[in-house]
């Protein structure tokens, strides 16, 4: 049985049909799905993602668990509909080391949510949710949208890029840079994994493509693009006034799915209470940008709880938090520990086959 067959089997399961009906009932604000162990939760969730019209946000316990869950979903659904929302820091926030790749992923999620795409799936974890994000207004004010066939002056585009803080270079190789060669503008947006190559014909955008940094060769043709700068620097200058909780950024009809609501609250509170290490402060003070501060840029456990209770919630951990409005019980089991003993694996398979399971 391959992944597609497994997913189809889950899609036709009566319990999954029951969950989908409950999620259409607006009176059900808190749903508990018990008995979903290991990747069973991912397979079950993939069906919900395919049928959803609202954003689904899966909040796992930590970065590693979220990474495994994201990998499972992308193996089933692909990467177009499933997004990963990490912390913007390379290690724990208290070390103060920003990660440009993670900031790209975060900005991409915000941009896609801003567009109002149906059935978008976001996988995240408490350390990422502890950090505030830019408000919808701030993101909109700092977003340049272009599409093939659009009439726009090339000089206007470069002026906007400069005003957004993009750095002019000969060759683009990292986010926040742009280059101009004849009628072509290369720009690396903080909302895209790959940089864009915009080809002009006079005052018209003739074509837009992504390209590989290493080879500088074009990769994929795009009909439209969104260019977003590094908003963290501009917000550091303005203070925390343009920042909100990620949950504040979400549409009100979003569904929050999690294993353990109380653990998320406690972990976010821990992240909020941690201070920057002396080494992190010293390192930042020695840079041109000066010392980093986390004041006003993190939410605490209480704020997370307050915001989360505004949304519909689905829990799929060992036990629910409080009394759910509805409960659906699955009957999956934890995989036995085989210790690389293939005889035990074979015996386990034979036993399942004798009980009329499909493998």
Placement of each model-derived feature along the sequence:
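Conserved beta-alpha structural segments and adjacent helices that either
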Residues: 1-359
């Amino acid at each position: 049985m391959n992944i597609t067959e497994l997913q189809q089997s889950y899609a036709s399961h009566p319990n999954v049909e029951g969950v989908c009906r409950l999620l259409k009932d607006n009176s059900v604000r808190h749903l508990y799905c018990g008995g979903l162990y290991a990747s069973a939760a991912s397979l079950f969730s993939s069906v919900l993602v395919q049928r959803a019209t609202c954003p689904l946000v899966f909040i796992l316990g930590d970065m590693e668990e979220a990474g495994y869950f994201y990998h499972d979903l992308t193996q089933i659904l692909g990467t177009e509909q499933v997004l990963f929302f990490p912390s913007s820091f390379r290690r724990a926030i208290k070390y103060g080391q920003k990660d440009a790749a993670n900031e790209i992923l975060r900005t991409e999620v915000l941009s896609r949510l801003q567009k109002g795409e149906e059935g978008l799936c976001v996988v995240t974890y408490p350390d990422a949710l502890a950090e505030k994000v830019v408000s919808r207004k701030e993101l909109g004010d700092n977003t340049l949208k272009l599409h093939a066939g659009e009439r726009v002056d090339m000089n206007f585009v470069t002026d906007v890029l400069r005003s957004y803080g993009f750095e002019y270079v000969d060759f683009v190789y990292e986010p926040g840079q742009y280059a101009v060669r004849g009628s072509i503008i290369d720009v690396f947006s903080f909302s895209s994994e790959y940089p864009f190559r915009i080809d002009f014909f006079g005052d018209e955008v003739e074509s837009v493509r992504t390209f590989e940094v290493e080879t500088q060769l074009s990769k994929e043709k795009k009909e439209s693009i969104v260019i977003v700068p590094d908003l963290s620097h501009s917000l550091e200058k303005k203070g925390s006034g343009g920042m909100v909780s990620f949950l504040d950024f979400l549409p009100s009809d979003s569904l929050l799915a999690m294993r353990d609501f109380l653990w998320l609250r406690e972990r976010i509170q821990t992240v909020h209470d941690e201070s920057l290490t002396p080494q992190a402060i010293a390192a930042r003070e020695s840079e041109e940008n000066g010392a980093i501060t986390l004041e006003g840029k993190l939410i605490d456990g209480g704020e997370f709880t307050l915001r989360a209770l505004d949304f519909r919630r689905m829990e799929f951990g060992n036990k629910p938090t409080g009394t759910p409005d509805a409960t659906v019980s699955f009957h999956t089991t934890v995989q036995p520990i085989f210790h690389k003993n293939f005889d035990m694996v074979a015996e386990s398979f034979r036993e399942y086959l004798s009980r009329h399971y499909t493998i």
